């Protein structure tokens, strides 16, 4: 996931990259957690390398020193002068952030991916060209963000805008998406990967009753599966609180007078500790990895019901404690979007942060590993196609984990509330609907979907190439922002790919911020979206074309990413004005250099 925009603010500790401060060397008294200190007071350890601030370059037409604070290339909404906000609002203001782009975890994503993931507004859905024409020459007051003005009550949404069709649309989504997930499971399990349909002479009511009976008998949420699912959630919560990690700070919160919340980031340690525990459970026979695949139906039901239960508790708990934020007054819509902005427990466990990576992407990886274990158990080998998905899902989960500190300044963390949308999507939607490529391979003999070995090798190479593009381009923009802060900390987390840092980059400077016009973003403005599309299509393509369900995620994602690109263009034009037009003139390609 990648962050979207920065807010000017009152002076505070130096940051290594946006929102992050270097942690001190561990003291013998505690080896569990690092703490944040001013940069000048800390030492580096063997896991990080600090690069000096880039040498200042005299202003030139195409290669210029960046401004005091930096906006990422894909920043898509307004910046806010926090000093002015703090003085005018006196700690009682409300603000809107920007959209979530892709980066680590698109989710995912935008991300985060994811993300991951980013949620577009209803007025950003126009075709890209229409958005370009609509936003030409639009000026912007940086002190007004999405209709918010200093002094407004943070518990009330003053924007006058709703997303996803308001109450009707969100009610439909909360009803139909779980039904779709069960429907796809039925097709994958009982209809050989095809769409379930009526038999000759079967009425619609009989067909519906038949499907409901299949869910009841094959996907009943047994108590044992509840125990597995919630044990995993609780153990991951313990890992979040207890394993080593680094501290970072989120974006300043206008309604809190510019307060920056601390976030603890240790998803990287959590991932490898989780994998070690799973290996022990598998080889000891206590919980073989293929159990996740064999019990996919009950697991699906438990995840869906858990999504609703956690959403209900989160919503009414926020109302009871008076923690609601930016409420529209429409209960169904507010339940979907959420009531509380920053729910936390024990002073360290941030629920939005916790659910963003560990639940969706780790579970997706567990299902792929379970499929590999099942094939090895049945056939004595693991097919190349399954290895491809294990590689793909590991790289994605690992990228989300190694770049977790970059998630804390994204749209999901800063702006989205903890409601049904985030809760259900992370607990059930992402891991148990994006996984149908894995489920198809698990349910069929390798001969059914076997690719030519040369084509399969080309798919591995192509995926690794686009992973390099995706990882390096997100690193370029985040490291550029960190270097503008004066210091850059390199965490030696695996894998480290080439071309992650651009020294003395070309930029376009505007009063609203600086636009990076170099590296990958000097070739195409949304090339990281292209990489994400490649990932999604590859997940479907590896299964072939015999079943529609592995293609649910690629089709869904491509529609979503086109919508997001239109929204990004709309907001960047409003934010940067002529500077963004100049960027489009210099970099005319949106997705693929020299093509489109």
Swiss-Prot record:
InterPro entries: ERG24_DHCR-like, Sterol_reductase_CS
Topology of the protein relative to the lipid bilayer: Multi-pass membrane protein
Record's subcellular location: Endoplasmic reticulum membrane
CC annotations in GO: endoplasmic reticulum membrane
A Pfam family assignment: ERG4_ERG24
Knockout-associated phenotype: Abolishes the production of ergosterol and leads to the accumulation of sterol intermediates. Leads to reduced deoxynivalenol (DON) production. Results in reduced mycelial growth as well as less conidia. Leads to decreased virulence. Exhibits a significantly increased sensitivity to the divalent cations Cu(2+), Mg(2+) and Ca(2+), as well as to the trivalent cations Fe(3+) and Al(3+). Shows increased resistance to cell wall-degrading enzymes and significantly increases sensitivity to osmotic stress mediated by NaCl and D-sorbitol, and to oxidative stress generated by H(2)O(2) and paraquat.
Organism of this sequence: Gibberella zeae (strain ATCC MYA-4620 / CBS 123657 / FGSC 9075 / NRRL 31084 / PH-1)
GO biological process: ergosterol biosynthetic process
Keywords: Endoplasmic reticulum, Lipid biosynthesis, Lipid metabolism, Membrane, NADP, Oxidoreductase, Steroid biosynthesis, Steroid metabolism, Sterol biosynthesis, Sterol metabolism, Transmembrane, Transmembrane helix, Virulence
Residues annotated as transmembrane: 168-188, 225-245, 269-289, 296-316, 353-373, 381-401, 419-439, 454-474, 535-557
Protein name: Delta(24(24(1)))-sterol reductase
MF terms (GO), sorted A to Z: Delta24(24-1) sterol reductase activity
Further remarks about this protein from its record: In Fusarium, the biosynthesis pathway of the sterol precursors leading to the prevalent sterol ergosterol differs from yeast. The ringsystem of lanosterol in S.cerevisiae is firstly demethylised in three enzymatic steps leading to the intermediate zymosterol and secondly a methyl group is added to zymosterol by the sterol 24-C-methyltransferase to form fecosterol. In Fusarium, lanosterol is firstly transmethylated by the sterol 24-C-methyltransferase leading to the intermediate eburicol and secondly demethylated in three steps to form fecosterol.
Taxonomy of the source species: Eukaryota, Fungi, Dikarya, Ascomycota, Pezizomycotina
PANTHER family from the UniProt entry: DELTA(14)-STEROL REDUCTASE (PTHR21257), DELTA(24(24(1)))-STEROL REDUCTASE ERG4 (PTHR21257:SF31)
